[in-house]
Amino acid sequence: MSKTEPSPRRQGAGSFFGRRRGKTLTALHAGLIQQMLPSLIVDLERPAPPDLALLFPVAVTRIRVEIGFGGGEHLVHEAENHRDSGFFGVEPFVNGMAKLLALVSRKELSNIRLYDFDAALLLDWLPANSITPN
């Protein structure tokens, strides 16, 4: 992509999700979005590493993806019970992302990475055959 072309994220082409925001975030949730999310977000402007395990600070042997995690309860449950798996959670709804960040912080999980826009873009970015089948 050239520097003059807008990124697909800014264009929003092909997006298939609903609203991005709900009620006003609490101070805690707004702080988590500002301070914690940048360290967990996947940067699709950079090429995906051939081994996605390199994106996690802990050793992971499997890669799983959860699209549309809502408030994150299921994603956190799975991440707690499968600490050898790296999880990519996708949720464009800011309020859901904030709820997940609170859970990740409370449970001190290191095997989760996040994306806050169109899941199709993340799926296109992932290397072929990188997601572990269940």
Residues covered by each model-derived region:
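S-adenosyl-L-methionine
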Residues: M1-V65, E73-H82
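A short acidic, Gly/Pro-enriched loop at the edge of an enzyme's catalytic core
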Residues: D124-N134
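S-adenosyl-L-methionine-dependent methyltransferase catalytic core, i.e., the SAM/SAH-binding region
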Residues: P8, L109, T132-P133
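SAM cofactor-binding core of SAM-dependent methyltransferases
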Residues: R62-D124
